[in-house]
């Protein structure tokens, strides 16, 4: 997988551009801000944007979706559970497809499995692509997503983190904010992945 990371906006949300080697298409994950910058990056890579994948619906992850989708006509995927809180999206959340636990997406030459990981929001998902986990705001390096915002659920994120800890092997962890990590490091040193603290 070819990958570029763009920390964008005031909250430095990580937007990821990814594609399989040799593919003429790419995907964006969580384009929260700066749509013109992201569109320019797609052009610089000489790719066609096939889809936007959203890990959840907070503004810092979805703010750039509408203009990017309008410009490119790309598909936009979000977990169906995120759409059950309409007041959060009074300005209209643009999407074309919903995903659920266990769905497998084939985009830009990549195969991505959807893992429903509620807690930060009811519809948070991670995307597992080979040895890489796009963890959104569920798992960060050394910590986890907050649960004190509307729709947050402390017990749910506990279960989601334990589920991620139980995934097989080591994985590269690419979170919604902050530095990349690995699942082995998070299992060992992230206090929120230690079952005993709950």
Where are these regions (language model features)?
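A generic "binding-loop/recognition-motif" signal
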Residues: 11, 34, 58, 82, ...
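Active-site neighborhood of phospho(di)ester-bond hydrolases with catalytic His/Asp-centered motifs
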Residues: 29, 50-57, 76-80, 116-119, ...
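Core dinuclear metal-dependent hydrolase active-site scaffold
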Residues: 3-6, 16-17, 102-128
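Conserved beta-strand hairpin/beta-sheet module of binuclear metal-dependent hydrolase folds
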Residues: 1-45, 126-136
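Short, acidic/turn-prone active-site loops that include or flank metal/cofactor-
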Residues: 8, 81-83, 139-140
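Active-site HxH/HxHxD metal-binding segment of metal-dependent hydrolases
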Residues: 26, 33-110, 188-194
